[in-house]
Amino acid sequence: MSHGGGGHAAELFPEDQVLAIGAVLSLIGIYVAQLFPSVSMLLGGLLAVGACVAGANTTRRVAAYGLGTGVPSIGMVSLGMGTISALAGVLIPAAFGIPVLVTPILTAVIAVAVGFIVGKLTQNPVGMKVPIIVSSMTKLSLMGALAILGFCSAFAGGFSADIIINGAISNGVIALAFIAAGMAILHPFNACIGPDESHKRTMTLAVACGLIAWLVFSIAKLDIVSTAVAAIFWLYTFGTFVKISLADACEVKYVPELPKKE
């Protein structure tokens, strides 16, 4: 059922299961990027898509309470919290001599804490009356952090401070991660919202958005194999989304080319 007129259909996939799968896949991808840098974009980039899909699913659930134009905003908040958490997770081990392999777990812990604090602040003093806002902010912060760290690690070839700083921060790639992952998290429900929204269609678009984010990073890295695989996966998934959309539509009207003269 939808809440507050937000336009959200019954769930086909339990949110906590989607969240757990997305978190596990993205964490595996982050470690693959560190331990096997030669396939960091091919496998690490692919598995980072899991965090985007899980984040999009949580956006769908919280936005159904009638956020309206807040759907894009909450996606940007997710990546804002995620960027802070990812940078802290990368830099703290280097500053305090902690083993670098704890970086992804530390990032996740920091993200959960940041998301919880921001969620509480949205209740008081901001005053949002969404019942699940604290848990949703916590989950969105976690998925944003894992998406940022996932794509940056895939591009740079690891997550140690020196690798990330030189390979993803100094060159501005982290900004690309912010926008690409942010769009993958906020866009699916924003595009599918309405009385005829379906979980299957929204999640199919979420996968397509995550895959196109991976494709963008593959192209930026000039990784031919990853680019080809990502393009094939994206074309198939987006094609599936279009077919589902046409099947769900009440009526399909094909608009001819606009006349060039009056």
Curated annotation (Swiss-Prot):
- What Gene Ontology cellular component terms go with this record? plasma membrane
| Family annotation (InterPro entries) | THM_MeTrfase_su_C
Q: Has the keyword Manganese been applied to this entry?
A: no
This protein's pathway reads: One-carbon metabolism; methanogenesis from CO(2); methyl-coenzyme M from 5,10-methylene-5,6,7,8-tetrahydromethanopterin: step 2/2
Can you cite a GO biological process for this protein? methylation
Hydrolase recorded as keyword? no
The EC category is translocase
Known catalytic reactions: 5-methyl-5,6,7,8-tetrahydromethanopterin + coenzyme M + 2 Na(+)(in) = 5,6,7,8-tetrahydromethanopterin + methyl-coenzyme M + 2 Na(+)(out)
Write the Enzyme Commission number(s) for this entry.
Answer: 7.2.1.4
> Chief localization class?
membrane
Transmembrane annotation, as ranges: 18-38, 39-59, 74-94, 98-118, 145-165, 173-193, 205-225, 227-247
User: What keywords are assigned to this protein?
Assistant: Cell membrane, Membrane, Methanogenesis, Methyltransferase, One-carbon metabolism, Transferase, Translocase, Transmembrane, Transmembrane helix
User: What is the membrane topology listed in the Swiss-Prot or TrEMBL record?
Assistant: Multi-pass membrane protein
Which Gene Ontology molecular-function terms are recorded? tetrahydromethanopterin S-methyltransferase activity
**Where in the cell?**
Cell membrane
Q: NCBIfam families from the entry?
A: mtrC (TIGR01148)
Report quaternary structure and partners.
The complex is composed of 8 subunits; MtrA, MtrB, MtrC, MtrD, MtrE, MtrF, MtrG and MtrH.
Instruction: Report the protein's function.
Output: Part of a complex that catalyzes the formation of methyl-coenzyme M and tetrahydromethanopterin from coenzyme M and methyl-tetrahydromethanopterin. This is an energy-conserving, sodium-ion translocating step.
Instruction: State the family named in the UniProt similarity comment for this chain.
Output: Belongs to the MtrC family.
Can you name this protein?
A: Tetrahydromethanopterin S-methyltransferase subunit C
